[in-house]
Amino acid sequence: MPLCTLCPRNCRIDRSKTTGACSVKGLKTAKASLHFGEEPCISGTDGRGAGTIFFSGCSLKCIFCQNMPISRDGYGKEITPERLGEIMLELQEKGAHNIDLVTPTHYADIIADVLTSIKPRLHIPVVYNCGGYEKVETLKMLDGLIDIYLPDFKYASPDLAREYSSAPDYPSVAVKAIAEMYRQTGKVQVFENGMMKKGVLVRHLVLPGCRHDSMKVLDILKATVPVSGIRISLMRQYTPCGKALEIKNLSRKLTTFEYNSVTDYAAQLGFDGYTQEKESATFEYTPEWDFEGI
């Protein structure tokens, strides 16, 4: 394995020998199953679900992460690229609407090779479900292989990105990444049943005390890609955990006023997409890391 430069950390570590900035070495996953917690156009509402593969490791260091065991601690099971391809085809056989690759950035080169080899047998869309901290050069490896990009756009403020994710360059990196994603997929396309066929769906988790930054995120997004060409998902599922409990703003849940301020602003800007109910702010969106399907 060459020195790793897949993510913006550019750690240049030989991940065949030691862990990189992403906290993992080889290809590791923690679960592969039909998943029903994504947006309706991804998971569906007919009981089929998204064919979700949760990868271990992450290039971001978000202090409020609810998936810490796999994102930071590297919990997971090592598999071969060949097995990854088999898992994708098995999920298709189970009736998945799509293949949903969660936190795939640090395996992008492997994923590109796997998708190239199985694409003739894979007849459902492939979703690249990521944190938005992506290098354009890495995304270009996937051009023509990914049907749906599902990135986060977490922050507009470099200061917030530094404090909460140890990534002050996050805003500038995410903007370029989302522009590249849109270049690859073009305007959102849907199947007759409303499921997403192609395009970009941008997620934003509204954080307590950060509603003005959330509005700035929407401003930047509108200036980056056509509002009518994408979908957005404004999430209110923030639940304090881990080190976030030690930070004043992050030690509480989001208020209805804060969330509605952001959703109202998104509507003013003309965005189309998804919102969440207050009851979503629980840990029930966090799966059990039981190696199912691996």
How would you name each of these model-derived features?
Residues S71, A108, G132-K135, F153-P171, ...:
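Conserved radical SAM core fold
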Residues S23-G144, I148, S157-D159:
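Conserved Radical SAM active-site core
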Residues R162-N193:
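Anionic-ligand binding region
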Residues M1-T19, G186-I294:
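Auxiliary Fe-S-binding modules of radical SAM enzymes
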